[in-house]
Amino acid sequence: MDGKTEMTMTTDVEAVVRRAYHAAEGNVMDVQGFIDLFADDGVINASTKSFRGEHLGWVVEFLHKFTPDIHRELHRVVVLGNVVAVELSIRGTFSGPVETPAGVLQLTGAKLDTPGADVWYVEGGKIKEFSCNVDRGSMLAQLGVHPDFASAVEAQAAAR
C-alpha cells in the first residue's frame, strides 16, 4: 500500500472514532448516531460489562443522565492500522442524585475530571470494538466515595 492510501485509511479510522466522541458530548448527545457508528456485531467493553446491539447507547446515556454537560478532552490519539488508542479526561458537573446499592448520593454540583484510556477497533468504516477504561478510583474519590476497607476485612473474616 502506498503512503497516500495508508494515510487516508488511518484518517478515516480516526474520523470514525472522533464522530463517536462527538455524538457522546453533553451538548450533542446523539445516542442513535453513536450506535449507528458500530458494526452489527460491535461491542463496548466497559469495566466489568460488555454491551451489544440496542444496549450500546446505554454507556453514553448513563453518564449523560448524571452529567449533562459531559465532555471528553482528548489528550493523545494514536492510530495504528485499524486501531485507535486515546488518552483522555472525562469532565462534567453532576446535576443530581445518584442511586447506589447503599442509598442515594447527593452529588449536585460535584465536578468530574477523570482520566481514561480508550481503545477502538474499526473495520470497514464501523466500530467493531470499543474498550472504555476509566480511572474508577479517581472518579469515586472526586465524588467523596472512598473504599470501605473495614467492611471488606469483616466480610472476609466472617467467611472463614
Predicted regions and their residues:
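A structural signal for short hydrophobic beta-strand segments in well-ordered beta-sheet cores
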Residues: V77, W120-V122
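Short, low-complexity N-terminal intrinsically disordered segments enriched in polar/charged residues
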Residues: M1-D40, A150-R160
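Low-complexity, intrinsically disordered terminal/linker segments enriched in charged
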Residues: K128-R160
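Short, surface-exposed loop/helix-turn segments at secondary-structure junctions
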Residues: G96-L107
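Short, surface-exposed coil-to-beta transition loops
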Residues: H71-E73, L112-A117
